[in-house]
Amino acid sequence: AAGKGFYEYPEGARKFLWPELATRYGRAQAPVPLADIKERLLFVQAIETVRCLDEGVLTTSRDANIGSIFGIGFPAWTGGVLQYINGYGLPAFVARARELAQAYGDRFLPPASLIERAARNVDF
């Protein structure tokens, strides 16, 4: 290790948490709901995958789903990243993405192509 980060590595002793960590960064004002944590992890990957389709990096839903499971470790129970969006329901996914964006930042804003697809209720 480089000797930098969250832990102190004293010579010949056990590592321990850097004492200034809590004072420098503190705790969040309010706890983040577990559902938000789970969905933030899934939604940010799903939104980026839609952008990859928009930009031609991915060309088929099948490639996106298989690649997301085997390539980036997206949970297999979802059927893949685009199947996750389909299962969530496109209009509901867009609505929830907007809620996450309002609470946690613009990286959760749904791309225009996803909004248009949701308006027509056309699955991937």
Task: Enumerate the language-model features and the residues they cover.
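N-terminal glycine-rich phosphate-binding loop for ADP-containing cofactors
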Residues: 1-124
